[in-house]
Amino acid sequence: MQVAVIHTAFEDSPRTVASVDVDDNMKVNEALEYAYRWTNNVMGSWSRKEKTFDDGTENGDYNDAVTVMAPLNEGGMGLRSTSMGDQMLLGTTKYKVAMCGFEAI
């Protein structure tokens, strides 16, 4: 099962930034939470597909289950974190990232 992550909160038009592979046995909320976590810059960069940075620092946000679908920013800077107002598509249902959790739209 896959979750498409669509950044819309701060963009002029929606942009699909990632596809996240999730376990088929996950409940909807679990799958959305997993995709949300792994498209956030918490301990590195989720979108820079490097296990270790040039300075030797481990990229704690690297995850093989995440496929980056959008080009990186200028200078190789990674993409922003998924935020409230962004969207996720799971199956045929689209969800909006809410202040707390997700809302089907």
Summary of predicted features, one role per range:
Residues M1-Y62:
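N-terminal non-globular leader segments, chiefly Sec-dependent signal peptides
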Residues M43, D55, N59, E74-M77, ...:
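Feature targets compositionally biased, intrinsically disordered low-complexity regions
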Residues A65-S81:
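Short alpha-helix capping/helix-loop boundary micro-motifs
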Residues M77-I105:
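Short, compact, well-ordered microdomains
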